[in-house]
Amino acid sequence: MQRLVVWDPVCLPLPPPPPAFKSMEVANFYYEADCLAAAYGGKAAPAAPPADRPGPRPPTGELGSIGEHERAIDFSPYLEPLGAPQAPAPTTASDTFEAAPSAPAPVPASSGQHHDFLSDLFSDDYGGKNCKKAAEYGYVSLGRLGAAKGALHPGCFAPLHPPPPPPPPPAELKAEPGFEPADCKRKEEAGAPGGGAAGMAAGFPYALRAYLGYQAVPSGSSGSLSTSSSSSPPGTPSPADAKATPAAAACYAGAAPAPSQVKSKAKKTVDKHSDEYKIRRERNNIAVRKSRDKAKMRNLETQHKVLELTGENERLQKKVEQLSREVSTLRNLFKTLPEPLLASSGHC
C-alpha cells in the first residue's frame, strides 16, 4: 500500500509534453524517465507542476518520435501474485505418473517500504494456507514399473489389479467341444500313428473331442464335404460309416444312439419266407379286399339312388305338363262361352 501512496520514481509525473503530445497524455501514457534524462543531458527530469499551473514544456525536437519515449501503465506487479508457486515441467515421458519431490518455491524477501499489499493479498488468496499445492508428477515407464513392483515410490499410482495375461492366438478352425471317456481315447490313439494327444487324454478323466468346421454329408447327397458353423448339429451318418467304427460306437455308450440305430430298433426284420409273414400278408390282402368291396357297394347304392331320383323327376315333369294343358283348355273354354251363360253361371 505504501508503494501506491508514496510515489515511486518510476511512476513520478513527468513534465507536460508539447501540444503535439497532449492527446497521448489524455490516454494515460507516460514518458520514460531514462529517455527524458538523456534528453536533458544526463540530469534527472524535473518534477511536473500541478495541472492548474502550466509550466514550461520541452521542445518537440528534443524528444524525437512518439513511439520511442512512451509506454502504458504496467499493472502486472499488482495483478500477478509474487508468491504463486510455479510447477516444473515433467522430466520423463512415459505411461504412468510418479510423484517427484517438489522443491519449495523461493519467496522473495519483501522490505517494509516497498511491500505490495495487493501482491500479498493475491498470494494469500491463490497460494496461501487455504489452497493446497497441486501434486507434481513425473513419468515412469511400464517396464521399470513391472521390474520394481515391490519397491514403488510412496506416491506412485500402483495398479489396483494385475494386468490380464495376453489372449491366446485364435484357432484356425472352429471347434465344437465334446467330451469322451479317456480310456476310449487311449484305445483309439494306441493304434493310430503319432500318439501326441494321448498324453493329454491320460491327464484328464475325459478327453476333449473337437468336431471340425466341416462334416460328412450323407451318402444320398451329391457332395463329400460341406462347411457348417459350430452351432449346427453334425450330419446324419450313413450305415456304412456306422458299421466302419463299431469300437468307437461302443466307447460312446453314454451318448445318444445314432438315428440309423433307432430306425433299426423300430422296424423288425422278418423273413419273407416264414409263415408269420405269409399270414400277415393274407390278412392285409383280406382287409384291402373288404375295403374295396365296401367302396363298390357305396358306389352302386349311390348310382341306384341317382336313377330313382331321375325317374321321379321325369314323372313330376310329366304331371306338370298335363296340368298346364288342362289349365290352357279351361281358359279357352271360358273365352268361347257367351256372356248370358256366364252371367247365369255367376248367379248359380
From Swiss-Prot:
It is found in: Nucleus; Cytoplasm. Pfam families: bZIP_2. Keywords: Acetylation, Activator, Cytoplasm, Differentiation, DNA-binding, Glycoprotein, Isopeptide bond, Methylation, Nucleus, Phosphoprotein, Transcription, Transcription regulation, Ubl conjugation. Residues 44-65, 79-112, 158-178, 219-277 are annotated as: Disordered. InterPro entries: bZIP, bZIP_sf, C/EBP, C/EBP_chordates. It comes from Bos taurus (Bovine). The modification Asymmetric dimethylarginine is found at R3. Binds DNA as a homodimer and as a heterodimer. Interacts with ATF4. Binds DNA as a heterodimer with ATF4. Interacts with MYB; within the complex, MYB and CEBPB bind to different promoter regions. Can form stable heterodimers with CEBPA, CEBPD and CEBPG. Interacts with SIX1. Interacts with TRIM28 and PTGES2. Interacts with PRDM16. Interacts with CCDC85B. Forms a complex with THOC5. Interacts with ZNF638; this interaction increases transcriptional activation. Interacts with CIDEA and CIDEC; these interactions increase transcriptional activation of a subset of CEBPB downstream target genes. Residues 268-277 have a biased composition (Basic and acidic residues). This is CCAAT/enhancer-binding protein beta.
